[in-house]
Amino acid sequence: MQGLMDESSPHEKYMQIRLTAFLCTPVLTELSAMTTEEREKLSHDAADYMNSLGSSKSLQWLSSKCTSEAMLEELKEGLRLLADVGKKAKETNTVLMIDAEYISINPAITSLALALALICNTDSAVVWNTTQCYLKKSYHNIQEEFKFAKANKIHYGAKVVRGAYIVPEGEAARLGGYPSPVHDSYEDTNRSYDRIVDWLLTEISHNTGKRSVRFILASHNKKSIQQAILRMNDLNIKLGENKVMFGQIYGMYDYITYALSKAGHPAVKSMAVGSVSDALPYLSRRSQENSAVIDGANEGRQLLKLEVLRRMRIR
């Protein structure tokens, strides 16, 4: 809660949260094992529970799904905390971006993110779920989320990333003897990312109703960013509407962020908050998610060198 400002601001703020900070992995794993229909029911019933401030009995059917009563109680406690964060986000004009995390718990994360969206996205898009484009089912998954938001008449927001767990997910599939859920190549992931961004931009351009559609293109890939900007121009998506955001990690690819901001695009920096031991694994995964990160760093150093030389000449 300390990451949410106490006072509202005319400027929109952004905060990333991980549901594993609210619920333990075993609970999320069990919920992820449920059927698609059960997880959709979970979204509605969890929203009802959060809306009732924990007094609703809508989650009692989960007693037969959880291996222990303690797990169900942990779910309820986690939802009460999540409801508090959602309420604070609405009060302080803060967008909550829900991290996707590992595929073994991602279905439950999506269900609970949609539950929070049901209670927070009635007036604007406060809760944005994350789509990991390295997954083969990513295009299908984001379309299903979009349909859910449309059917329930709530505003829609998304965070689009390539994904930070490519190596461990592929290794887990190999050791487990099941087909890898991730795309076979980095090029396939790029195509997946650009396809999803193009689809979202098209939905934004076709959206004439009161229900807003927004997303953040979280990427260090110049080609994807350039393609998105060209597509925005083709679709006449105006900058001042803030329907499309751009984001990079704090301390990485600053020249891209600054160039976007200078051109009038809403651009933000993502910063990990916590101890060094907590933050380093997070940043390491983000480095792995883009195979061009080293080349990009070299390019950044070259640009920095040119800027230093330019300033020396000015003096």
What role is predicted for each listed range?
Residues M1-R315:
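Positively charged, amphipathic and often flexible ligand-engagement surfaces
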